[in-house]
Amino acid sequence: MNKDYNMIKFISEIGLNHNGSCEIAKKLIKQSKEINCDFVKFQIRDINQIYHPDFLKDFSNSENANQYIFNEIKKAHISKRDYLSLFKFAKKINIKVMVTPFDLESLKLCKRNEVSAIKIGSPDFDNTQLIISALKLKKALFISTGMAKDKDIDAIKKVLKKNNIFKVPITIFHCVSSYPPNEDEINLKYINVLNKKFPDYTIGYSGHERGYLPSLISIYFGSSVIERHLTLNKNSKGPDHNSSLTKSEFGNLIINSRLITDQLNHKKISQKKFLSQFKLLPAKNSIGEQIKTVSLNSEFNKKVLSKSAIYRKNFKKGKVIEVKDL
């Protein structure tokens, strides 16, 4: 558990919830500042780096889930120039910028002075090339584990230990890559395990549940950073709106977290007693067990959102493949 519960940080994830509109993005940035979030986060993709040229020419033969995600990404496209404008707007109103780059080309934008931190999303948890390249930028690094099994987490621990030569501050997020997850998928107790696995790192919780109760309870189990999506309207079209928080909900999460941290700092309290104030039993609902499981929903989303190595073009037999060829 945390030694100081007053250090809880909050990340407002905009993601695709701007729907391709800079004006909506600015409203979300402003709201994030008004409710005292520490970071506002953007997702940046270069579809020419992520998708195979054949898919971009004609994706009608691909699986429906791939078609849906690709269409949503295209609808919510914002140019690099617009992102730079949004970075400057965030800096102007004094809220830190975090970026999730989905490819090496998008990572280049993270070199900007306006970008304070980088987050590696769950689909890229095992993308060691992206992680190592991000570490070289010497900025705080946040990594989500939503699609990872225990063995994957142990493997990435070795990668981080070997390659974090600049001693970049690292945060590991407990996460479930369902949008939204069922309560029995959330498994907040695994935050305890991550704190033991990574004693030198900060541990956080990246939530996609409806409402914010599990996010709030995550503090008890050792979360020092909480990330949630922010939306202007939960009924808006798009993949993340229905698992996002409104300004009012997010603000209440932050206010209530201060009450909980004050409670936990002043006295030790049993799990049963702590949960009883939320009318939850210790072994039910979102609490789970200290065992890492990847739900069927997360497995499905991993298949749709994660990457695989493919050739950029056809090569003659005997060609020695280099990184630039993939």
Located regions from the model:
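Catalytic cores and adjacent flexible loops of soluble metabolic enzymes
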Residues: 1-326
